């Protein structure tokens, strides 16, 4: 199946699951934006294998186009750039307390970017964790998930403190430190 037919398949399956009123555009870049938007708003319901296969094929093509960065030296590295390009053991996601990712279409937050590149399996997996846990994730705590369509093997989801007014309190500093 060629790329346009494949991404159309993924989009059409997700459009049929939801009532968005959105239509499938003509160009690949617009189709990619729509697919990401649909991934962003999709509830963590079990996807069909057909959807997973179509989505995974498109995300693999996008990953190849962006390029994968391999860090050959062992240890902890500081990276400035697109974290979804890193082929490492784990990347860290600044998650919300529901761990389900950002539901705002095309939002630029790291939570949205990671969930978009990992695919719908990540939200479904996080939902299973949260259902088993039975409560929101506490600030300063973390959960580890597979990376799914990311080059990284794992994603460490940690919930940081909300610091609304400039300088953090001592407690907020300690909570932030416990995240990392």
PLM regions and their residue ranges:
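Macrodomain-like recognition of ADP-ribose-binding/processing modules
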Residues: 1-180
């Amino acid at each position: 199946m060629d790329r346009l037919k494949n991404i159309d398949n993924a989009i059409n399956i997700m459009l049929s699951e939801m009532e968005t009123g959105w239509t499938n555009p003509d160009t690949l870049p617009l189709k990619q934006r729509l697919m990401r938007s649909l991934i962003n708003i999709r509830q963590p319901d079990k996807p069909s294998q057909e959807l997973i296969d179509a989505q995974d094929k498109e995300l693999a093509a996008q990953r190849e186009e962006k390029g994968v960065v391999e860090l050959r030296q062992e240890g902890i590295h500081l990276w400035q750039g697109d974290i979804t390009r890193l082929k490492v053991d784990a990347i860290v996601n600044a998650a919300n307390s529901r761990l389900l990712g950002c539901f705002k279409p095309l939002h630029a937050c790291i939570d949205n970017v990671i969930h978009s590149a990992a695919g719908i399996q990540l939200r479904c997996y996080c939902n299973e964790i949260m259902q088993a846990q039975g409560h929101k994730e506490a600030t300063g705590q973390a959960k580890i998930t597979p990376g799914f369509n990311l080059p990284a093997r794992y994603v460490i989801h940690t919930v940081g403190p909300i610091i609304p007014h400039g300088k953090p309190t001592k407690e907020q500093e300690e909570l932030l430190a416990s995240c990392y």
